Amino acid sequence: MKNYLDNINKAFESRARLGIMSVLMVEEKVDFNTLKENLQLTDGNLASHLRALEEAQYIQVEKQFVGRKPKTTYQATESGKTAFHEHLDALEQLILNNRKDE
């Protein structure tokens, strides 16, 4: 019997990272404050999850100044998009297989 959990990507196990990638799959670029408001996360919590996704090379970070204010934006990389689609496919397959057993 195949273990369907093998295809679940650990980088997307948390609700926060799943939310971050979901937003970035819909929007090309999103700034820190927009992610924070939409996902209802604290600055520190969001920053740590963004850092983990950046280290996995699933997101790209762009820092710039708008006037005198810093602005950080995030976007999903191609490898991040691929990994996220594969994760969603694995979840879907897991759900479908569990429904067959009912």
Regions found by a protein language model. Name each.
Residues V61:
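Short beta-strand "wing" residues that participate in macromolecule-binding interfaces
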Residues Q57:
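Glycine-centered, phosphate/nucleic-acid-interacting loop/turn motifs that mediate DNA/RNA or nucleotide
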Residues V66-H87:
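Basic, amphipathic "hinge/linker" alpha-helix immediately C-terminal to the N-terminal HTH DNA-binding motif
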Residues H49:
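Residues within the DNA-recognition helix of helix-turn-helix
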Residues N3, N7-N45, V66-G67, T73:
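N-terminal helix-turn-helix DNA-binding core of bacterial DNA-binding proteins
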